[in-house]
Amino acid sequence: LSLDKLRENLSFNNIFYKDESRRFHLKSFKALGGAYAVEKISKGKKNMVISSATAGNHGRSVAWGAKRLNLKCKIFVSQYVSQTRVHEIEKFGAEVIKVKGNYENSLEECKRLSKKNNWQIVQDVSTKNYKYIPQLTMAGYSIMIKEISKQTDH
């Protein structure tokens, strides 16, 4: 989508906007990342259970990716996440687990139960000892960059 008026006002050569809201019917700019990571880590693992903590967008992508591959999925959310966002995740077959407290509390509970139950965590944020899956998530986002490059001849 070209933004000619804004481009003129800012004196830029070009400004483009890429609408990701319709990809996979996820209504999210994060549609590619989590789903891509789920696909890459689950190859040949039919009984894998995927888990993630989210405030909404990443969880939808992870849930969609798990559903597409017929994998069970557990998504942890804070008690403050809206019921609308919970429903958007549940419609892709994930079990949503509400956790008392904020996002960090939901992440800690996700880690605790995932370790206890041998579930595979798919988070988009790296830490000192957790880099591979966030890198896969970023690789999923890079698909958009390739598309933008083709669509804009840049």
What are these regions (language model features)?
Residues 1-154:
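PLP-dependent amino-acid enzyme catalytic core
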